Amino acid sequence: MNSMRVRIALVLVAGLTGSAAFAEDGVTDGKIIFGQVAALTGPAQDLGQGMRQGILAAFGEANRSGGVNGRILELKSRDDGYEPEKTVEATKASLEEDKVFALIGAVGTPTSKAGQPIATGAKVPFIGPFTGAEFLRNPYNRYVVNLRSSYFEETEAWIDHLTKDLGISRIAILYQDDAFGLTGLEGVQKAMAKRNISLVASGSFRRNTVAIKSALLDIMKAQPEAVVTVAPYKPVAQF
């Protein structure tokens, strides 16, 4: 996670820890305990591990300056392997066993979709998930703190650049066949519909795999001028 974004989150946390409206689990006179549920193993582990290291770096910086409101920040991470079923188990354990004040640094749309309702149900802040999914933005949820643009905003920027700046209209998409990929697909389709154009081809693949040969063949048959991708890094690298 970008350290500047974490610092912004910490400013918000400073306000939350002083508010009786939020849960007090994980807050003592000396520290604030955060939980992270993310992919620390498996094909998406680079995302989860990178997020964890970024949070730890930002927490370390804050702690060297005295923490937040005089409290040292602590992170307890749990692995979900980028599988929603494991996210549910790990999120419940984080709340019930680790007694965290807030969850931070979730990775992925399907996993956030599994974990966020549990956090919200417990009135626990859900901070900085690595996803631009709409369900975290609409309707407004006071327990969700987003630190990135939505997928719809991002896909609009892609298509605007391709069509306006590069003059490209024959566009295909490679996407992961889950909540993450389907939301990105919807965003691309919306952006293209605004310009009266449509995808010339699409290819999809299952989560937690790099088996994208079939998707590649489907896309290449259409001879697109550009391919946009809504997928983790490793499958895109294979593509």
Regions found by a protein language model. Give the residues of each.
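Solvent-exposed, charged/polar functional surfaces in cytosolic regulatory/catalytic domains
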Residues: 57, 61, 65, 93, ...
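Hydrophobic alpha-helical segments typical of transmembrane helices
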Residues: 36, 51, 58, 90, ...
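Beta-alpha junction/loop-to-helix N-cap segments that form part of ligand/metal-binding clefts
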Residues: 27, 31-33, 46-53, 61, ...
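Generic beta-structure capping elements
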Residues: 37, 127-129, 150
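Extracellular/periplasmic Venus flytrap/periplasmic-binding protein
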Residues: 86-89, 133-135, 142-239
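Acidic/histidine-rich, surface-exposed loop or edge segments in extracytoplasmic proteins
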Residues: 35-43
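Short, low-complexity disordered leader/linker segments with a strong preference
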Residues: 1-33
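Residue-level signal for short, function-critical loop segments
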Residues: 40, 81, 177
